[in-house]
């Protein structure tokens, strides 16, 4: 069932149609296939809101600054970006606790902070930094997950237009260490400091010249900030990203040392500075660890949700949850990632599976579909290590908040998850109120699926095998510990939906419990709220689309709250306009306390 487009939902489709025509007319080295673009244009009504936002950003990313976009189209984009950002969890600068103070005698002090998060969601900050390229126009490759892309996507096309005008006025490219200052446009920060750091070859050690160039970036940023007016409250602050450490390949640990020492030295040499706050902003866990060693750990003060987040979607979601008769939690990979069990994390894989790096594997996700194991001993060395790691995963603060809250609903709460990690059970949620349609690490199965009962519990086999796994190579050294089907003797694997061989038998009881629970709740006409956590687009037919369908077929008695990172967290705007769905965009680990406590 589809509803009529209203408000910003209609504006989004109209804007996308015009942008697609613009990209086709003006050409693009990246979105060069006109047929694909025409296909998108003809089928916009069938795309999810999340997909439309992603397509909008791609079109704007690849678009050259000339010809200038018409003002009415820019205003449409502004309204779309405004709606998107109303759903974000924000971090006010006043919620940060300083790691250190740089005192200036009787003139006060500059607070130094360390904060990990999305730099575009920091509020109350005068300026943020952008690790730019020498052209100063942003990144034109939408697949690059660089901060240049992120900042331009959030600021909107007016930022590229201003960058172009300022670069034209300069008449030359930016050199390493130079800074270009622009307005923030659709960003929360009033200004952006675009700087170009030194670019190294991957794996190379920086030269003394490159070290000086990186230091110059931070000096130039502080000098440019000094020239800006203070904010209304008298503060003047800058959020500093990790310059040159991504695609520019500057070693992250050395870059952190240069950043901290340069900023500290500059502030000490300028006791009359008007800069009140400097925030070292990190995005990865490894970068955070480097800065923590230099500055001390980061802290965020405990402040009320009203102060900490936008009023719109978060307040509405809290209201729905507080008045719900029943709650269905549907959880995807984003919930596990929020607890540190991130299947895309290179740091996690390198730390826990060093013996598997030589096979070209870089993350837990990269193992999906991997069949080039040298032997079964290597394959099961990995699987047993993986299962043991997950079974002993103890850092689950989100579950520690979520599950006690869910228990308040008694039999009117249910959990349905595509995660196989078993963390709901491990944190005390009853199996009678749990459905895992994609399988579970709790069982191993015959790869031939020779019989319905060709499954075995995994925990005893893991415990028996772990003493025989070489800690360096992570190879299973005792071949007798390799599990084989007790019926046909064939290979076995974890019992998850990874191929046509998947044995669903161990999970049929959970599916029956889910169907019975849903039928009862709907029959009793309870006000049901679906709290969807970290469900993306990898397998939308399992949780995401059924949730939306249930909302549309409920005559207003079922509402959906979608929580997650990035555009995938968006709900259909048509449903949102009807007051049936909303979303909270941000880290689930931060969202759950704000929603439930």
Swiss-Prot record:
Signal peptide: none annotated. GO terms for molecular function: hydrolase activity, acting on glycosyl bonds; metal ion binding; phosphoprotein phosphatase activity. Zn(2+) 2 binds at residues 446, 450, 485, 488. SUPFAM superfamilies: DHS-like NAD/FAD-binding domain, Macro domain-like. NAD(+) binds at residues 333, 418-421, 438, 584. Its cofactor is Zn(2+). ADP-D-ribose binds at residues 118-119, 133, 146-148, 244-246, 248. The keyword Lipid metabolism does not apply. Keywords: Glycosidase, Glycosyltransferase, Hydrolase, Metal-binding, NAD, Nucleotidyltransferase, Transferase, Zinc. It catalyses: 5-O-(ADP-D-ribosyl)-L-glutamyl-[protein] + H2O = L-glutamyl-[protein] + ADP-D-ribose + H(+). Binds 2 Zn(2+) ions per subunit. Pfam families: Macro. Zn(2+) 1 binds at residues 139, 144, 146. Residues 99-299 form the Macro domain. Its EC number is 3.2.1.-, 2.4.2.-. Residues 307-597 form the Deacetylase sirtuin-type domain. Monomer. In the N-terminal section; belongs to the MacroD-type family. Zn-Macro subfamily. In the C-terminal section; belongs to the sirtuin family. Class M subfamily. Is probably a bifunctional enzyme with ADP-ribosyltransferase and ADP-ribosylhydrolase activities. In vitro, can act as an ADP-ribosylhydrolase that hydrolyzes ADP-ribosyl-glutamate bonds. It can remove the ADP-ribosyl modification from the human mono-ADP-ribosylated PARP1 E988Q mutant, which is primarily modified on glutamate site with only minor aspartate contribution. It cannot hydrolyze the ADP-ribosyl-arpartate bond in ribosylated S.pyogenes GcvH-L. This is Probable bifunctional ADP-ribose hydrolase/ADP-ribosyltransferase.
């Amino acid at each position: 069932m589809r509803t009529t487009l209203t408000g910003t939902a209609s504006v989004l489709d109209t804007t996308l149609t015009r942008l697609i025509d613009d990209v086709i007319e003006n050409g693009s080295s990246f979105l060069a296939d006109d047929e694909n673009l025409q296909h998108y244009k003809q089928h916009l009504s069938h795309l999810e809101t999340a997909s439309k936002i992603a397509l909008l950003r791609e079109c704007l990313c690849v678009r050259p600054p000339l010809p200038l976009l018409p003002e009415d189209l820019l205003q449409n984009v502004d309204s779309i970006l405004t709606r998107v950002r109303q759903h974000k969890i924000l971090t006010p600068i006043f919620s940060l606790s300083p790691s250190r103070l740089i005192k200036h005698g009787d003139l006060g002090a500059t607070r130094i902070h360390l904060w990990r998060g999305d730099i575009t969601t920091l509020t109350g900050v005068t300026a943020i930094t952008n690790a730019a390229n020498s052209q100063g126009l942003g990144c034109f490759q939408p697949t690059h997950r660089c901060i240049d892309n992120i900042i331009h996507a959030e600021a909107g096309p007016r930022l590229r237009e201003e960058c172009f005008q300022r670069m034209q006025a300069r008449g030359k490219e930016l050199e390493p260490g130079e800074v270009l200052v622009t307005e923030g446009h659709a960003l929360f920060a009033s200004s952006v400091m675009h700087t170009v750091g030194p670019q190294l070859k991957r794996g190379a050690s920086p030269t003394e010249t490159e070290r000086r160039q990186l230091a110059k970036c931070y000096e130039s940023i502080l000098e440019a900030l000094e020239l800006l007016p203070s904010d209304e409250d008298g503060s003047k602050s800058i959020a500093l990203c990790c310059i040159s450490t991504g695609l520019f390949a500057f070693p992250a640990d050395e870059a952190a040392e240069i950043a901290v020492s340069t900023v500290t030295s500059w502030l000490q040499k300028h006791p009359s500075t008007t800069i009140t706050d400097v925030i070292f902003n990190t995005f990865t866990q490894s970068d955070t660890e480097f800065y923590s060693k230099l500055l001390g750990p980061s802290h965020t003060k405990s402040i009320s949700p009203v102060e900490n987040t936008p009023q719109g979607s978060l307040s509405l979601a809290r209201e729905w949850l507080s008045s719900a008769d029943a709650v269905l939690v549907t959880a995807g990979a984003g919930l596990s990632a929020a607890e540190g069990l991130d299947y895309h994390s290179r740091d996690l894989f390198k730390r826990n599976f060093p013996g598997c790096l030589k096979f070209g594997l870089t993350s837990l996700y990269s193992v999906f579909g991997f069949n080039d194991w040298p032997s079964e001993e290597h394959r099961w060395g990995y699987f047993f290590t993986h299962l043991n790691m997950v079974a002993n995963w103890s850092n689950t603060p989100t579950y520690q908040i979520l599950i006690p809250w869910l228990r308040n609903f008694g039999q009117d709460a249910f959990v349905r998850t595509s995660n196989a990690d078993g963390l709901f059970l491990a944190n005390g949620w009853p199996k009678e109120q749990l459905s895992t349609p994609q399988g579970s690490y709790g069982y191993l199965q015959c790869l031939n699926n020779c019989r319905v009962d060709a499954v075995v519990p995994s925990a005893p086999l893991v415990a028996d095998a772990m003493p025989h796994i070489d800690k360096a190579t992570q190879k299973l050294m005792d071949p007798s510990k390799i599990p084989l089907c007790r019926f046909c003797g064939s290979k076995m694997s974890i019992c998850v939906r990874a191929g046509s061989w998947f044995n669903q038998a161990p999970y049929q009881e959970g599916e029956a419990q889910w169907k019975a629970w849903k039928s009862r709740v709907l029959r009793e006409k309870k006000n049901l709220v679906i709290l969807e956590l970290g469900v993306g687009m990898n397998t939308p037919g399992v949780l995401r689309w059924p949730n939306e369908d249930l909302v549309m077929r409920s005559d207003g008695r079922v509402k959906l709250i979608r929580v997650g990172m990035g555009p995938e967290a968006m709900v259909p705007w048509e449903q949102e306009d009807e007051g049936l769905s909303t979303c909270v965009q941000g880290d689930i680990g931060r969202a759950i306390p704000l929603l439930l406590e």
